[in-house]
């Protein structure tokens, strides 16, 4: 525990908890402090001026990160016939219909993204209580209910990141790995923020993008000046 406390003090040293850092400086500080033995995930957190308890202030969407996420994404596809073949050819890890339903109902969920053709949504709907809480339920708003199975699988594998506002008006997104060059991380963050801003709901009032912070898996959170991330 003493060794862990020393490491935490070391990564926090030199960071002003009140200051809003320009994005490039924040990323430099963060990368200097990624000392774990694995490739840490870099995450951005956005505080939005919305109350998601109101339907007209819900924020949800998807962002195709220009430099990928660095993650190996396992994709499951509900499809039959030619669309099932298309999914397999596109690189989907699991493809099925009733058989996939039974596998999931049996408690085996070995995927990170779930895609379905529209005709199979009545079947997939039976998994709402299982997939919904895990953020895996296919949804046309984020392109995971579609006949373009090939495109959806490619997007998921290539770094598409779904986002959804939480109760406190916060959105989190993993936007890359500590091994990424800082400029690539910055491009991903700006693309992610742009996607969230474009998803601004009609019911949002006042300042929409209120606070921005970046962090790593084992590192500190660093506050970022919003104007260096997105220009309104």
Swiss-Prot record:
Identify the PROSITE patterns for this entry: RIBOSOMAL_L1 (PS01199)
**GO molecular-function annotation terms?**
rRNA binding; structural constituent of ribosome; tRNA binding
Q: Which SUPFAM superfamilies match?
A: Ribosomal protein L1
Can the keyword rRNA-binding be found in this entry's annotation?
yes
Q: Does the keyword Ubl conjugation apply?
A: no
The record's annotation in InterPro entries points to:
Ribosom_uL1_bac-type (IPR005878), Ribosomal_uL1 (IPR002143), Ribosomal_uL1-like (IPR023674), Ribosomal_uL1/biogenesis (IPR028364), Ribosomal_uL1_3-a/b-sand (IPR016095), Ribosomal_uL1_CS (IPR023673)
A cellular-component GO term for this protein: cytosolic large ribosomal subunit
Keywords assigned: Repressor, Ribonucleoprotein, Ribosomal protein, RNA-binding, rRNA-binding, Translation regulation, tRNA-binding
Record CDD domains: Ribosomal_L1 (cd00403)
According to the record's subunit comment, the protein's assembly and interactions are: Part of the 50S ribosomal subunit.
Known function: Binds directly to 23S rRNA. The L1 stalk is quite mobile in the ribosome, and is involved in E site tRNA release. Protein L1 is also a translational repressor protein, it controls the translation of the L11 operon by binding to its mRNA.
Q: Which NCBIfam families match?
A: rplA_bact
- Homology family: Belongs to the universal ribosomal protein uL1 family.
| Record's protein name | Large ribosomal subunit protein uL1
Please tell me the species this chain comes from: Xanthobacter autotrophicus (strain ATCC BAA-1158 / Py2)
The gene for this chain is rplA
